[in-house]
Amino acid sequence: MNYKKFYKVTIERQKLARAFLSASGMGELITYIMNAIYVSASYDEFLTMKYLLARNILNCRLYPVSIPAVSEANMKSIVTTIKGTSNLIEFPSRKYNPAGVFQHTDKANQYIIIDTQFDASMDVNVLASAFNMDKADFMGRRVPIDGFGNLDNDRLAELFADDPYYVEITDAEKEALNAIPLALVDENFFMIYDNLNEFREVENGQGLYWNYFFHQWKTFSTSPFSNALLYVPATPAVTSVTVTPATATVSAGSSLALTTEVVTTGFAPQTVTYTSDNDKVTITEGGVVQIDSDATGTATITVKSTFDETKTDTVAITIS
C-alpha cells in the first residue's frame, strides 16, 4: 500500500510575534509546529500498520495457534503455549510464514503485538519469562495496541481513496479481530519505506500568516517470508477444499487455469499445494495446469491444504 499525504499547520503573525517575548518562546513555537504535524503523521502510520495486520489476519496469512479462552484461570496454559511456539520458530521451518520458505526467528528478533486488555490481565514478568528475557528487554519487544479490530475506517478511506486494493473492514470482521489477544511476528514482518519527508513554508501576504506543509510519501507492506503467528481462542480448521473444474479435456501443448476455494475457520491458512501424477503435466503455484506438447493419456491433479493435509480435492484431465 502507498500513500502521498501532506499535513498543514498555520501560524499567524501574532503567534509568531509572541514567540519573541520570552527566551523559550521560539522553542515553544517550533515544538508546537512539530507536534501538530508529527502527531497526525504518526497516527496515520500507526493506523495503516494496524490495517495491514488486520487484513493479513482476515486473509489467513498468519499461522494460527489455538489457545484457551482468555481468563485468569487459563493464563498459565496460554503462556505455556506462547513459550512453546516462540521456541519452535527458532528452528527452520516452512510452516510459519505465508510463502512457505525455510525460515527461523531468533528470540532477539521476535516481537509480540498485544491487546492492551489482555496485557493488563497478564503478568508482564511471566510473559517475559516465556521469551527467556528479563522485564526490561521484553518491554522493548512488546507492542501494545488498542485492539486488533479498532480501526478508523473514515480516516483509512481518506488515506487510500485512490488505492484500488483498499477494502474496508466490516463491523463483523472487527468483532472477530477484537477477540484476538496477541500476535508474534518477526522483526522484518512489516516493510515500511519512507520515500519522501519534506517541509515547505508558504507566506500569505494578504492574511499575514504562514502555512507550513509536511509532505510524507510512504510504502507499506508485509513480508511473506517472515514468520508470523496469531494466537486465537478458537480451533483453527479447514472445512473444505474445492477446485473447479472437476473434470476437463485439454489439448496437448495448452494450459488450463484452475479455481480453488478453501473454506476455513479460526483464521486457518487457505494455502494449498498442487501435484500431478503425469510427468508431462505440471501445475504452477497459482493453479495453472500446463500440458506438454507430447503429453498423452490422462492426468489427475491433487489439491491439498497446507494446514490440514486430509482436506483435498482432485481434477481429472483428459489430454486430447
Task: Spell out what each predicted region is.
Residues 235-320:
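Extracytoplasmic soluble-region selector
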Residues 2-65, 212:
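Long, contiguous amphipathic alpha-helices that act as assembly "spine/axial" helices in icosahedral shell
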Residues 61-160:
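Extended, solvent-exposed, turn-rich assembly/linker loops in the middle of proteins
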Residues 22, 115, 185-186, 278:
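Polar helix-capping/helix-linker motif
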Residues 53-57, 75-86, 120, 187-192, ...:
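Generic hydrophobic, helix-prone segments enriched in Leu/Val/Ile
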Residues 141-236:
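Extended, compositionally biased alpha-helical segments that mediate assembly or anchoring
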